[in-house]
């Protein structure tokens, strides 16, 4: 028989997997974002592609970003109209958590927390 805890853990893992997005991550120098807040290169922030930004519906929510065996988190503060489906644009501090800034672009998985 399965325990309640095992079932809940399986449901949580499935929910996260279903909600996960895949796309290219690039970096930018933050300033005044579409959500109305000013940030800088050291801020843990992200700009979402137009579809995921959803006219600001996700402003100030946090996302988890995974790639290259690394994980980091960033707060939604801006729109990235040039990002493709699933694409995100992050502050240098966040990009550096996943890959060297010299790389410039890396494919990532990410999801809303």
What are these model-predicted stretches?
Residues 2-113:
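Secreted/periplasmic proteins
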């Amino acid at each position: 028989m399965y325990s309640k805890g095992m079932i809940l853990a399986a449901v949580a893992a499935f929910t996260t997997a279903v909600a996960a997005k895949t796309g290219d991550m690039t970096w930018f120098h933050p300033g005044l974002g579409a959500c109305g807040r000013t940030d800088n290169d050291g801020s843990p922030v992200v700009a979402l592609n137009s579809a995921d930004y959803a006219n600001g519906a996700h402003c100030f929510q946090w996302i988890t970003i995974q790639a290259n065996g690394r994980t980091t988190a960033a707060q939604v503060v801006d729109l990235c109209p040039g990002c493709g489906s699933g694409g995100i644009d992050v502050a240098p501090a966040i990009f550096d958590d996943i890959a060297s800034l010299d790389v410039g672009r890396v494919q990532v998985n990410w999801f809303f927390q």
